[in-house]
């Protein structure tokens, strides 16, 4: 498996397209090998689950509000009609500091809608240092394609 030894082809495709859809073997290991190769090439990497991502662009790049779980407690006039809102810093804020390339690997990407996947592609085109890999399901062997190609079909 020369791909897992070097990762050059994967890195070239990632740099050319910006956003890739990956089908990885279910036993795992491929994502960490490729992330290790990307780190060796100078990328700053992060591995996240796509579940609970919400609006991907806002979650990743902007300061946004979240509501903590209710847990059955009564509020005694401490919040608005919609409940307490806490402000959260952007998740990619610290990674985008500096000049290094950033690679974000999203697990369980099959739960994302078409519009969310399109917004991830748009985010990659607006931020030239950001590369996003979305795991779209399992396969017997590692394969990938540009996200734009997946969305077109």
Swiss-Prot record:
Organism superkingdom: Bacteria
Family: Belongs to the complex I NdhN subunit family.
Function: NDH-1 shuttles electrons from an unknown electron donor, via FMN and iron-sulfur (Fe-S) centers, to quinones in the respiratory and/or the photosynthetic chain. The immediate electron acceptor for the enzyme in this species is believed to be plastoquinone. Couples the redox reaction to proton translocation, and thus conserves the redox energy in a proton gradient. Cyanobacterial NDH-1 also plays a role in inorganic carbon-concentration.
Subcellular location: Cellular thylakoid membrane
Keyword Membrane applies: yes
GO molecular function: oxidoreductase activity, acting on NAD(P)H, quinone or similar compound as acceptor; quinone binding
InterPro entries from the UniProt entry: NAD(P)H-quinone_OxRdtase_su_N
Gene Ontology cellular component list: plasma membrane-derived thylakoid membrane
Topology within the bilayer: Peripheral membrane protein
Pfam families documented for this protein: NdhN
Keyword Iron-sulfur set for record: no
Record field: catalytic activity: a plastoquinone + NADH + (n+1) H(+)(in) = a plastoquinol + NAD(+) + n H(+)(out); a plastoquinone + NADPH + (n+1) H(+)(in) = a plastoquinol + NADP(+) + n H(+)(out)
Source species: Parasynechococcus marenigrum (strain WH8102)
Chief place of localization: membrane
Assembly with partners or alone: NDH-1 can be composed of about 15 different subunits; different subcomplexes with different compositions have been identified which probably have different functions.
Enzyme Commission number: 7.1.1.-
The protein's name: NAD(P)H-quinone oxidoreductase subunit N
Keywords, alphabetical: Membrane, NAD, NADP, Plastoquinone, Quinone, Thylakoid, Translocase, Transport
């Amino acid at each position: 498996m020369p791909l897992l030894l070097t990762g050059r082809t994967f890195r070239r495709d990632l740099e050319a397209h910006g956003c890739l859809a990956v089908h990885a073997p279910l036993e795992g290991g491929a994502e960490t090998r490729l992330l290790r190769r990307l780190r060796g090439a100078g990328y700053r990497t992060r591995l996240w689950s796509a579940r609970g991502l919400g609006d991907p662009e806002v979650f990743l790049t902007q300061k946004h509000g979240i509501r903590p779980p209710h847990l059955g407690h009564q509020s005694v006039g401490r919040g608005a009609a919609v409940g307490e809102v806490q402000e959260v810093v952007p998740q990619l804020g610290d990674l985008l500091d500096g000049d290094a390339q950033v690679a974000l690997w999203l697990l369980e990407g099959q739960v994302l809608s078409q519009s969310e996947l399109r917004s991830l592609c748009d985010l990659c085109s607006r931020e030239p240092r950001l590369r996003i890999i979305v795991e779209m399901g399992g396969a017997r062997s590692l394969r990938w394609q540009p996200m734009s190609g997946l969305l077109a079909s």
